[in-house]
Design a protein with these regions (language model features):
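Beta-propeller and closely related beta-sheet repeat lectin domains
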Residues: 25-28, 84-87, 135-138, 194-199
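Active-site-adjacent segment of 2-oxoglutarate/Fe(II) JmjC oxygenases
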Residues: 139-142, 146
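Beta-rich carbohydrate-recognition and catalytic domains
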Residues: 1-22, 30-85, 89-131, 145, ...
């Protein structure tokens, strides 16, 4: 690993508000064919009000340093902590952005990876809310499909903090931005630990790895046990 470097962003966003406490934790980026990087980031507009705004920043990379070039639409909610921990995916020529919020996760899409439609609440294809809240979601693109990795309410999991287990995967309809309920599967079963903080590694067009560390064992029946780190390998026939 090389030395730690900082990405310099403008002092103000498009609305004229200051850009404060920028970070890109828990995000998925998209690397473009020309070497540019589409990096989702979040920031505060007010140091006294911890309400996040999320953007996608286009950056260049020269092999050592990441340099900001531009960013697109700015997305937030007025309540609580706003929209944060954004993750980006490219699928069939469009870009899809999922964002964490305290009450309900949100989703949007756009053509260029920078500018997006107004966000909407994540829902199943029957119109009911997905029930994912106050933790991150991530994308998987494999086998010609677009999938979401998430946790949610309503899975006999009221004993789990913020309903952060089990860890699910389901296919997304890219036209409606809804999760197809019949495709939902459990990636990692609930075992008295939280599973909300997962990661996705796209190995190839036909293989993706999901990693997830258990958390908060002290709150459940496995108190004083050692937590586990789970690895799930997803493959497709092409």
């Amino acid at each position: 690993w090389g030395p730690l470097r900082f990405l310099t962003l403008p002092q103000k966003d498009h609305s004229g508000k200051p850009i404060i406490a920028v970070n890109a934790g828990c995000t998925q980026r998209v690397d473009l064919p020309n070497g540019d990087i589409l990096l989702p980031v979040r920031y505060w507009r007010d140091a006294k009000k911890h309400n996040y705004t999320s953007i996608v920043a286009r950056c260049s990379f020269d092999g050592e340093s990441l340099t900001y070039k531009e960013h697109g639409t700015e997305h937030t909610l007025p309540a609580r902590r706003g929209l944060y921990e954004p993750s980006l995916a490219e699928f069939e020529g469009e870009f899809f952005l999922t964002l964490r919020a305290d009450k309900s996760a949100c989703v949007t899409h756009g053509k260029d990876g920078l500018n997006f439609q107004p966000t909407r609440e994540w829902r199943f294809d029957d119109g009911k809310p997905l029930g994912s809240y106050n933790t991150q979601q991530h994308w998987v693109t494999i086998g010609g499909g677009l999938f979401l990795v998430y946790t949610r309410r309503g899975a006999d999991n009221d004993h789990i903090m913020r309903h952060r287990a089990p860890l699910f995967i389901g296919q997304v309809n890219p036209e409606t931005l809804q999760l197809i309920r019949s495709t939902e599967r459990i990636l990692i079963p609930e075992n008295h630990a939280t599973l909300g903080n997962s990661g996705v590694c796209r190995v190839s067009d036909t293989e993706t790895w999901i990693t997830c560390g258990e958390g908060l064992l002290r709150l459940g029946k496995r108190k004083e046990q050692t937590n586990k780190v789970h690895f799930v390998r997803i493959t497709s026939g092409g």
